[in-house]
C-alpha cells in the first residue's frame, strides 16, 4: 500500500475497530473461496460497541483491505471514517442497520449463493423455505442463540422477500420478514442471496455457514429422491 492509501486509517488504525476491519477482510476472502460471493457482490459488517465497520461497494471481495472500509456510528448514523479512495458505501447499509436495530446483532453477512437462487424457484409459491431432518439444524439458532437452537426434527422456516432493482429498496420488506419470523437468523432475497446475522461475528459466520450448508444438502437430497 502506498503512502497515499496509508495516510488516513483513522479509527481503523488500532484497537477493536481495527480487529473488526481485519476480520472483515479475512471473511470476505473466505466467502469468495466458498463461492458465496463473486466479484464485488455481497457484503459484510461487524459491530464494535456503537460503531460498525462495513465493506464498501466496488471492491472485489478477495482483494478487500483495511483501507477500503467504512466506519459508521450506530447512534448518529454518520460515517466516522470514509476511504481515501472515495469508494461508494455499500448498498446493503440500510439493511445492515435494520438488522442491528431489530435483532441487536453484532454482525451481518450478505451472500450471493447459487443455492439461494435455486431455492427461490423451488419455493416460488411459498413465503418461506422450510426443511426438517437435517443434523445441521442443531447449529442454527432460533433467532438468537439465547433462545436456543433448532433440533434436527424441527421444521425450520426461513422467509423469502422479493428482489428489487436497488439493494436499499429491500429495507422495508426485510424489516417485515424479521418481525414476522422471530425464530429466523436469516432472510432469503429471491433470485439474489441471503442476509444472515448473529450475536457475535463468530456466531454470524457459523450461522451463515450452517444455513448455506442446509441449502446445499436440501438441494442435493432432492436430486437423489426418486420422482413419485
Swiss-Prot record:
Intrachain S-S bonds: none
Positions annotated to bind Zn(2+): 110, 112, 192
Keyword annotations of the record: Amino-acid biosynthesis, Cytoplasm, Lyase, Metal-binding, Methionine biosynthesis, Nucleus, Zinc
Top-level taxon of origin: Eukaryota
Top enzyme class: lyase
A Pfam family reported for this protein in Swiss-Prot or TrEMBL: Aldolase_II
BP term (GO), one: L-methionine salvage from methylthioadenosine
Residues annotated as the enzyme's active site: 135 (proton donor/acceptor)
Subcellular location: Cytoplasm; Nucleus
Record-level Gene Ontology MF annotations: methylthioribulose 1-phosphate dehydratase activity; zinc ion binding
Binding site for substrate: 92
Reaction(s) the record says it catalyses: 5-(methylsulfanyl)-D-ribulose 1-phosphate = 5-methylsulfanyl-2,3-dioxopentyl phosphate + H2O
EC number: 4.2.1.109
Subcellular location, principal: cytoplasm
Any one Gene Ontology cellular component term annotated for this protein: cytosol
Requisite cofactors: Zn(2+)
Cofactor remark: Binds 1 zinc ion per subunit.
Pathway field: Amino-acid biosynthesis; L-methionine biosynthesis via salvage pathway; L-methionine from S-methyl-5-thio-alpha-D-ribose 1-phosphate: step 2/6
Family designation: Belongs to the aldolase class II family. MtnB subfamily.
Role summary: Catalyzes the dehydration of methylthioribulose-1-phosphate (MTRu-1-P) into 2,3-diketo-5-methylthiopentyl-1-phosphate (DK-MTP-1-P).
NCBIfam families reported in the protein's UniProt record: salvage_mtnB
HAMAP family with a match to the protein in the record: Salvage_MtnB_euk
Protein name, entry field: Methylthioribulose-1-phosphate dehydratase
Primary gene name: mde1
Amino acid at each position: 500500500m502506498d503512502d497515499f492509501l496509508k495516510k488516513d486509517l483513522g479509527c481503523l488504525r488500532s484497537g477493536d475497530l481495527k480487529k473488526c476491519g481485519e476480520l472483515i477482510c479475512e471473511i470476505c476472502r473466505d466467502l469468495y473461496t466458498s463461492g458465496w460471493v463473486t466479484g464485488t457482490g455481497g457484503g459484510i459488517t461487524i459491530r464494535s460497541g456503537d460503531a460498525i465497520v462495513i465493506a464498501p461497494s466496488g471492491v472485489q471481495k478477495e482483494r478487500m483491505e483495511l483501507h477500503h472500509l467504512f466506519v459508521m456510528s450506530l447512534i448518529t448514523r454518520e460515517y466516522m471514517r470514509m476511504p481515501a479512495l472515495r469508494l461508494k458505501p455499500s448498498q446493503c447499509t440500510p439493511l445492515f442497520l435494520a438488522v442491528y436495530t431489530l435483532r441487536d446483532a453484532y454482525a451481518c453477512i450478505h451472500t450471493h449463493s447459487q443455492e439461494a437462487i435455486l431455492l427461490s424457484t423451488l419455493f416460488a409459491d411459498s413465503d418461506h423455505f422450510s426443511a426438517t431432518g437435517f443434523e445441521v439444524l442443531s447449529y442454527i439458532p432460533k433467532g438468537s442463540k439465547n433462545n436456543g437452537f433448532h433440533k434436527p426434527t424441527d421444521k425450520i422456516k426461513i422467509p423469502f422477500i422479493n428482489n428489487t432493482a436497488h439493494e436499499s429498496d429491500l429495507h422495508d420488506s426485510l424489516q417485515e420478514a424479521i418481525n414476522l419470523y422471530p425464530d429466523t437468523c436469516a432472510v432469503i432475497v429471491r433470485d439474489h442471496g441471503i442476509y444472515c446475522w448473529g450475536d457475535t461475528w463468530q456466531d454470524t459466520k457459523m450461522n451463515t455457514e450452517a444455513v448455506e450448508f442446509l441449502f446445499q444438502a436440501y438441494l442435493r437430497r432432492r436430486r437423489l429422491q426418486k420422482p413419485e
